[in-house]
Amino acid sequence: MIMIITKKTLLPVTLALFSSGVMAHGYVSSVEGGVAESRAALCKFPANGTGEKNTNCGSVQWEPQSVEGPDGFPETGPPDGKIASAGLSQFSPLDEQTVDRWVKRPMQAGIQNFEWTFTANHITRNWRYYITKQDWNPNKSLTRSAFDLTPFCQISGDMAKPPMRVHHSCNVPERKDYQVILAVWEVGDTAASFYNVIDVMFDGDLPTVPDWAVGGQIYPSMDLKSGDSVYTRVFDASGENSALSTELTIETEQQGQANNWSYSLAQQINNVYDNIRAGKADGEGNFAPIYGANPIYLKEGSGLERVEIGYNIITPEPDHDLDISGLENEYQIGDEPVSLELNLTAQGDQFVELTVYNHNKEALANKQVTLNDGDSQAVSMRLSKSEPGHHMLVTRIKDSSEGSLIDQITNDFHLTEGGDPPEGDYDYIFPEGLKSYTAGSKVLATDGRIYECKPFPYSGYCIQWSPSATQFEPGVGSDWSTAWIKLN
């Protein structure tokens, strides 16, 4: 577990309407007993039990659920060298591959429980799990040749929607040391799959050290600034023993680099205590600090149980908050192109970039605004084309001085045909009241026609819709006729 004490206050971005990750679907997690989190998930969420996180991940830290690429692996799918990113350029940092680049989660051969968490639970064909060969090279880009291309586990999705979280019991093959597991979720209603690589460390990587046992780890999870400090929290049977804490205060920018302070803290521990050691063990009682993750060993018989890492972040960082108002849930298409009339109000200096995409991910409008603390500014975004269907407003908020991404939010809205609704007998204007649709329900669709939900067993498809899964949308979805009868 990692404890962070900080004077920085993080304020959520305030929005005038519901935000959702539209181009977002699912990732390998460990919320309810999953054995290990994916590389992408650890870019956003701390590891269960240790608090470790991946760093310098790029934009996937905001949407680990979106690592989606072409299906058909291994025959097709993402190209070699881009498997971890699913071939998406915005997630290319995931393709970096060295023996010490990523957090590794403990793994054992045998039956293990893998967990997926979904933000949009599509109809599923199957899930497949692959693992690297024992002799793979962890310092080369991930290619098909690194993997055993026969999945060690395959779970059928039965072409049905799974619950929002699923677990798979899989028999993991024997391996040693650092390996990568590739989890593939093949969606059943699109030509896409989701690719999650999982970095794992099998038992046996750390040498057996007589009279010593592993009690923790110094993981270089982030760079620190001058004045910040990192320290150990040592626990025995009675709880935390603060007298045994070792603290390292950062004095220079170079010392604050993650691998450097990890080395220095391990070195300081070894210089102070006889019953605590940190670094790479040689099996003969010698411990050498390294520039990277340093295991912490406790002397057997010392009464010590574990060591955790804490941070004292005293360097203040500016608070940022952005209020966006004026975005409607629905816009009617008229003679003129649709225009979004928004108002932005900033807390903290920031650079804001707004982009409108249609459901095909075409950019239709872009606006860039620099706001000072307290500024309020009207923004007009005229769309390059106005066609019925689902659209997204993507807002990227960056620090105006450094250009670093603070937050990214996606908001949904729809364009509909203009004019008064046609005369006719219908119960809902699609997709209003979606969860209430049953056999015989009549809806006015976005094409201006009226559709009736088919009888059982097809009626269940009528409620299977989301902005990112539109195959059963009446009149326009690829499989709309499976669920609906056109009435006019």
From Swiss-Prot:
Q: Which residues form the Chitin-binding type-3 domain?
A: 439-480
Q: Which Pfam families match?
A: GbpA_2, GbpA_D3, LPMO_10
Signal peptide location in the record?
1-24
Domain spans labelled Chitin-binding type-4:
25-202
Record keywords, A-Z: Chitin-binding, Secreted, Signal
Which InterPro entries is this protein grouped with? Cellulose/chitin-bd_N, GbpA_2, GbpA_D3, GlcNAc-bd_A, GlcNAc_Chitin_IntDeg, Ig_E-set
GO MF, one term, reads:
chitin binding
List cellular component terms (GO). extracellular region
Where in or outside the cell is it found? Secreted
SUPFAM superfamilies reported for this sequence: E set domains
**Major subcellular site:** secreted
Q: What does the sequence similarity comment in the record state about its family?
A: Belongs to the GbpA family.
Q: What does this protein do?
A: Probably interacts with GlcNAc residues. May promote attachment to both epithelial cell surfaces and chitin.
Indicate what this protein is called per its UniProt record: GlcNAc-binding protein A
